[in-house]
Amino acid sequence: MFVRKSCYSLINATRRCLRYRQLSSTTAGTVGTTAPTANISLNDEPQPAAAEMDEFTKEFLRNRIEVSDIQRLILSAGSSVAALVDPRRHDMIACLGETTGREALEKILHYMRSTEEGQRILVEKPRINTRTVDMEALKKMPEHTFGYTYVKFMEDNNITPDSRMEVRFLDEPGLAYVMTRYRETHDMVHAILDMPTNMLGEVTVKWVEALNTGLPMCYGGAVFGAFRLRTKQRQNYLRKYLPWALRTGNRIKPLMGVYWEKRWEQDVTELRKELNIELLAP
């Protein structure tokens, strides 16, 4: 009983902190005639002038919420408990990813800067939603292409690329874009791995993503999500899915460096071979 009360107290504190920071952010953005000047990037370098910023950076700096170290700790602890209590709280899961993933995001950013394809992603900062991706055109592609595989996966699972939350609790635009890219390409990882969006599929993909990206929230989702599997699912998970996920996560190439949108026309089998992906046997 004490543990339960403590958990809900922590969750309520997180909600209050979220509401307070959102109110503060809204007020700061509407009062006065100048924009806030406290936005500092990595190594305390000043932000570039607005005219030099890309659209993602402008939008991120308008909407981000600055938090102190104490507030970040509260958000991290509270969101982790809330996500465990109710895995459907995508806002809490998103908050957890942003407040615990800085080190992993920095490593991903460093890797992306080291490859030609990754550099192109970081320069162009593509977004994935129904305004930027022509889903109807993908439907008309040959069935063996990655583009067709992706859109069929989205339709079969009745999901949309427009459902991803904005990044708000990171303080550096580069890291914010990496987190945004992770969220927006999550469905593409499902598609390339041929994993459904049910609980078993999500837990399996989270293991692959955890080992591939190092993001703490992925490890948390993989470990604690498994406890929510039904008995039969848990048996299949331990016997087939978990060993495959661990093997796959350790052997495949870094997926965050893949410019998926430039691979629409590529043969999906060829793409999987390039990334060292072997599908789970039926």
Swiss-Prot record:
It is found in: Mitochondrion inner membrane. Zn(2+) binds at residues 186-187, 190, 202. InterPro entries: Coq4, Coq4_euk. It catalyses: a 4-hydroxy-3-methoxy-5-(all-trans-polyprenyl)benzoate + H(+) = a 2-methoxy-6-(all-trans-polyprenyl)phenol + CO2. Its cofactor is Zn(2+). One of its GO terms (cellular component) is extrinsic component of mitochondrial inner membrane. GO terms for biological process: ubiquinone biosynthetic process. Pathway: Cofactor biosynthesis; ubiquinone biosynthesis. It is a peripheral membrane protein. It is an enzyme of class 4 (lyase). Residues 1-30 form a transit peptide. Keywords: Lyase, Membrane, Metal-binding, Mitochondrion, Mitochondrion inner membrane, Transit peptide, Ubiquinone biosynthesis, Zinc. Its EC number is 4.1.1.130. Belongs to the COQ4 family. PANTHER family: UBIQUINONE BIOSYNTHESIS PROTEIN (PTHR12922), UBIQUINONE BIOSYNTHESIS PROTEIN COQ4 HOMOLOG, MITOCHONDRIAL (PTHR12922:SF7). Component of a multi-subunit COQ enzyme complex. Lyase that catalyzes the C1-decarboxylation of 4-hydroxy-3-methoxy-5-(all-trans-polyprenyl)benzoic acid into 2-methoxy-6-(all-trans-polyprenyl)phenol during ubiquinone biosynthesis. HAMAP family: Coq4. This is Ubiquinone biosynthesis protein COQ4 homolog, mitochondrial. It comes from Anopheles gambiae (African malaria mosquito).
